[in-house]
């Protein structure tokens, strides 16, 4: 954020910690800075800060990549579970702390089972990212209550640290409590990352790659989205700061055109997030998936985005990610009630 301070322009570079009607609190290297909103001249998005030396797509924390993913899949109902926010609500004030546990609810999508990703569960989840300012057991109970009150099947998203089998600090606090509360973990989902410059050279499409802003009914059908969930799911699809729907089109000998693959690529925090990548069974191992990855990476490059992430919920998709040259970054589990 660039703002005026005592008549001079100055910059505050960092993560927004709090927002009030009059100020932003930004975590900078020199400590928290309160920036008057009426003094802001301009602002722009920056990628997550590196945590160690290395390749750009490998040096961000798992927590930051979870924030990137959340920014591209944002339901209408979102809240940060933090003791300070609860205190603000008791005083009749708007919550202002943007840390702790991220709560998301999109109840119409709770029953959607997406084979290509965990997106429906993520939209109805509690994501522990930091200290909620209260005992973990209390935070878990409040998160479950918040989700159930909104008609969402509660999921608790836990994850490892980057390039490690160890759980993240926040996940370490909540994971031991889950089974006692009747939660069971999903199979692990592997988060992959890669530089867009390399993916952009992966494969030229044999057919046509068509871009659009919104999914067609056929997209919802191949993604397994029932009619009753499509309105809310459409909001999720378009919730990223920027996104594109990609369709791979094949032309038959008689000139008939058929969609043989589809994907969604979304952009936030100088990252591309590839999801909903599906290929028609008759077109697998024909390069359709690789062509969609290439097209996504080229769209990212055109926006100055240098890194891409992709989540693989099973061995087949993990093998595909490896074949594209992607690297494993961290793993995610969705804990859900055992009765679900």
Identify the meaning behind each predicted range.
Residues 1-8:
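Short boundary/loop segments of OB/S1/cold-shock single-stranded nucleic-acid-binding domains
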Residues 8, 17, 41-146, 170:
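N-terminal charged segments
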Residues 23-29, 35:
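SH3/SH3-like beta-barrel fold
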Residues 32-44:
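A short macromolecule-binding patch
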Residues 88-102, 167-180, 242-261:
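Conserved beta-hairpin
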Residues 109-110, 136-214, 224, 310-319, ...:
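Acyl-donor-binding surface of acyltransferase catalytic domains
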Residues 136-145, 276-281, 285-302, 323:
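Conserved acetyl-CoA-binding loop-helix of GNAT-fold acetyltransferases
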Residues 202-276:
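Flexible, substrate/cofactor-facing loop regions flanked by secondary structure
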């Amino acid at each position: 954020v660039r703002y005026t301070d005592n008549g001079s322009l100055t910059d505050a570079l960092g993560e927004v910690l709090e927002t009030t009607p009059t100020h932003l609190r930004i975590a900078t290297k020199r400590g928290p800075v309160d920036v008057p909103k009426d003094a802001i001249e301009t602002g722009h998005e920056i990628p997550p800060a590196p945590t160690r030396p290395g390749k750009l797509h490998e040096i961000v924390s798992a927590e930051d990549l979870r924030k990137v993913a959340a920014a591209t899949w944002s339901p209408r109902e979102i809240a940060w579970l933090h003791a300070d926010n609860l205190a603000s609500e008791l005083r009749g004030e708007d919550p202002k702390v943007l840390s702790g546990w991220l709560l998301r609810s999109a109840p119409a999508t709770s029953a959607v089972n997406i084979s290509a990703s965990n997106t429906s569960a993520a939209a109805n989840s509690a994501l522990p990212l930091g200290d909620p300012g209260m005992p973990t057991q209390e935070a878990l109970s409040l998160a479950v209550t918040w989700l159930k009150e909104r008609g969402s099947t509660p999921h608790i998203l836990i994850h490892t640290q980057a390039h490690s089998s160890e759980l993240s600090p926040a996940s370490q606090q909540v994971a031991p409590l889950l089974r006692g509360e009747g939660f069971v973990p999903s199979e692990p989902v592997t988060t992959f990352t890669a530089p867009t410059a390399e993916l952009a050279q992966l494969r030229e499409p044999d057919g046509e790659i068509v871009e659009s802003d919104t999914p067609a009914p056929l997209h919802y059908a191949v993604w397994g989205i029932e009619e009753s969930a499509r309105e809310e799911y459409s909001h999720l699809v378009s919730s990223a700061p920027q996104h594109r729907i990609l369709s791979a089109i094949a032309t038959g000998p008689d000139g008939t055109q058929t969609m043989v693959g589809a994907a969604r690529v979304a952009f936030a925090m100088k990252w591309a997030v590839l999801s909903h990548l599906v290929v028609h069974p008759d077109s697998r191992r024909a390069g359709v998936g690789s062509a969609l990855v290439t097209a996504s990476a080229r769209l990212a490059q055109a926006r100055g985005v240098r890194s891409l992430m992709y989540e693989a919920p099973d061995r087949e998709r993990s093998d595909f990610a490896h074949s594209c040259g992607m690297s494993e970054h961290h793993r995610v589990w969705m804990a859900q009630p055992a009765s679900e």
